[in-house]
């Protein structure tokens, strides 16, 4: 039997930053994009890249647990990379139950 002070679930949002980078299909772009995460000690949760029909490079990156200020800063840095044309940023929140 559980004691009277048993844990009860509460919702806490877990945030995932999502970046969509559109750039010229240049092999030097991918390491420069990854470097922005690596030099902060971060390994992206998900990384997908593909070359489109018009020889443009599309990179989709997800980074779990990244706070909003760092997300905005990394997005600004991505936009400064030569050859990067567009950087879109969004945020996914997933609620999870926590025992308290």
Where are these regions (language model features)?
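A conserved regulatory-domain signal marking ACT and ACT-like small-molecule sensing domains
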Residues: 1-100
């Amino acid at each position: 039997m559980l004691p009277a002070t048993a844990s009860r679930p509460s919702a806490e949002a877990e945030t995932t930053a999502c970046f969509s980078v559109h750039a010229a299909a240049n092999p030097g772009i991918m390491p420069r994009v990854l470097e922005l995460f690596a030099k902060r000690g971060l390994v992206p949760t998900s990384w997908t890249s593909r070359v489109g029909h018009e020889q443009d490079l599309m990179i989709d990156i997800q980074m779990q647990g990244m706070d909003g200020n760092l997300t905005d800063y990394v997005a600004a840095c991505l936009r400064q990379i030569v050859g990067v044309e567009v950087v879109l940023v969004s945020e996914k929140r997933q609620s999870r139950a926590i025992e308290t």
